[in-house]
Amino acid sequence: TQVFHPYIKKNRGWKRILLFIEFAGVAFIFGLMCVAYLQCHYIINRDMGYQPKGVASCKHDFAEPDNARNNLKSLPYVEGVASIRGSMTWFGNREVTDEGGKVLFTPRCAAFDKDFVPLLGLHIKTGRNFTGERQFLVNQPYVEKMGWKGSGVGEIVPNRGTVVGVLAPFCCGVLPADNEPLEIEYGTNLRNVHVRLKEPFTENLHRLNNEMKKIYPQEDIEFRSLEQDLERYYRPTIIFRDATFLAFITILFITLMGLIGYINDEV
């Protein structure tokens, strides 16, 4: 039997190396799983800077926007109506130039009507909401990019209008709050209509869509939950979290089987 001792010792060495690799893999995947879980928890539960709960939206070009707004306001389960160009999941971009036409920077941009800020529960930390044409709301990074020394209220956006308010930080889609300069201009009868519904939200959303089919039978109008639209942008993070959890369970099972086999061989 002594002839086989070197082979047995060599075989044990490989088993130990394999076990070490497996335990290292478990530790790595466990760490990755913890990071993914914390990231997912932060994104889903962070303060958005506004209140998406109870809000539904629909992108549609109404032939008579004022009439459509009045129809929505008349419904007993609708608390408010507002509109936006863009959406709360993405904003466009527009160059800001000086009076000579030189490009200064390119902020995220959108247009709100005067009811959108209160409907969503956005906060204005300085100044006021806009009331008419050629008025703008911006955020603090925008003020800093422009090099304005004061709060920014009353400053002129070259060739375009006046800043009337500075918004408190809020999230656009999955982007962190105040991640980039933001410029919101005043608009009316914008394409993306938002409504705030009374509780129970799901039931009233169903009633709203049925009512739209009755009023506009020839048009495809469907309001969707803003919260669910936001969750679609979190889905890749949720999928990655679940994938790391499954990988951890799999490699942990393999490692335990290897450990049990090693112990049985040694006993």
Question: Model features per residue range: what roles?
Answer:
Residues 63-82, 133, 140-148, 159-241:
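"Rare, low-scoring activations can occur
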Residues 3, 43, 233, 265-266:
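Amphipathic alpha-helical segments that mediate coupling or scaffolding at interfaces
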Residues 37-144, 149:
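Structured, solvent-exposed hinge/loop segments at the ends of secondary-structure elements
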